[in-house]
Amino acid sequence: MRHYEITLIVHPDQSAQVGTMMEKYKEIITTGGGKIHRKEDWGRKHLAYPIKKIYKAHYLMMNIECDQEVLDKLNYNFRFNDAILRNLIISEDGVITTPSIMMANKDKEKGRS
């Protein structure tokens, strides 16, 4: 099985459904024999440029290990989910479990408050 990093940009009006959306994708991955090594919710962030006249969006990121069939099923679900504005799937060399830079920055900001 290969390792992938998936980043999702979700419509801000659908932020309340992010939890159920992630559970659905987790179920697809685990029933296909895959594993989720890291799952992060970056929250609402400003977009670098507007997408469909939207200036903020909810960001999600996960590192998974799965085969091509599961990845195709996930990609199909991402494509036909209107709540997902953009998705990015990157192939990784190995397992990544350390917090991302975004989460490290978020933790630093919480520490200052």
Swiss-Prot record:
GO process terms (BP): translation
Record's keyword annotation contains Ribonucleoprotein: yes
Keywords annotated in UniProt: Ribonucleoprotein, Ribosomal protein, RNA-binding, rRNA-binding
Signal sequence segment: none
One Pfam short name: Ribosomal_S6
Any GO molecular function: structural constituent of ribosome
Disulfide cysteine pairs (residue numbers): none
GO CC annotations on file: cytosolic small ribosomal subunit
Record keyword Ribosomal protein present: yes
Function: Binds together with bS18 to 16S ribosomal RNA.
Family per similarity comment: Belongs to the bacterial ribosomal protein bS6 family.
NCBIfam families per the UniProt record, alphabetical: S6
Protein name in UniProt: Small ribosomal subunit protein bS6
Species the sequence originates in: Ruthia magnifica subsp. Calyptogena magnifica
Encoding gene (name): rpsF
